[in-house]
């Protein structure tokens, strides 16, 4: 069995270029949560020239709306949200420097093309394993849009968060490859 490949967030172009669709990796470092309501607000703020709550350069956004934390824990269950819900907003944020998105499910051609253009990557987190994902979160802090409740933007410090490369920066798609390989 090969050694775990642990990536340190934030991400450089070289790290993103080294990733291939189907790779399983682990993320450690600072990432952010944001779902569709937060994405909509971020894009509106960009259009209005307002400052962003965090610098997108090299950053990762996890499409998740965590459950409330139990006593003594930094966060509750934190499973992935369907990435396609962010497709209308993702190209704008990628163009602003966002390198990594973490969610579940397929993405639009526009998102795939934008990842290729700006050297980005889309990871799938393990659906149905929200409690496991929460164990990888060492700290969590709401940094923007507290009024959105579970959809507020949070800064997470994670340790070895397991993810799979779905879309690499060459446009390769692990879901499509899997469908081709397992067709009967």
Region annotations inferred by a language model:
Residues 90, 166-184:
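Active-site/ligand-binding-proximal alpha/beta "capping" segment
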């Amino acid at each position: 069995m090969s050694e775990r490949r642990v990536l340190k967030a934030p991400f450089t172009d070289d790290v993103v270029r080294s990733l291939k669709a189907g790779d399983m990796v682990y993320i450690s470092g600072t990432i952010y949560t944001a779902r569709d309501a937060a994405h909509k607000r971020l894009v509106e703020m960009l259009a209005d020239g307002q400052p962003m709550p965090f610098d997108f350069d090299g950053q990762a956004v996890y499409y998740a709306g965590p459950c409330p934390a139990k006593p003594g824990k930094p966060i509750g269950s934190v499973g992935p949200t369907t990435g396609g819900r962010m497709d209308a907003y993702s190209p704008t944020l990628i163009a602003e420097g966002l390198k990594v998105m973490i969610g579940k499910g397929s993405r639009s051609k526009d998102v795939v093309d934008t990842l290729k253009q700006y050297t980005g990557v889309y990871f799938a987190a393990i659906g149905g394993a929200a409690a496991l994902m929460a164990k990888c979160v060492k700290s969590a802090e709401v940094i923007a849009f507290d009024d959105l409740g579970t959809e507020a933007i949070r800064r997470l410090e994670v340790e070895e968060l397991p993810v799979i490369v779905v879309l690499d920066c060459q446009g390769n798609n692990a879901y499509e490859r899997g469908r081709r390989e397992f067709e009967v």
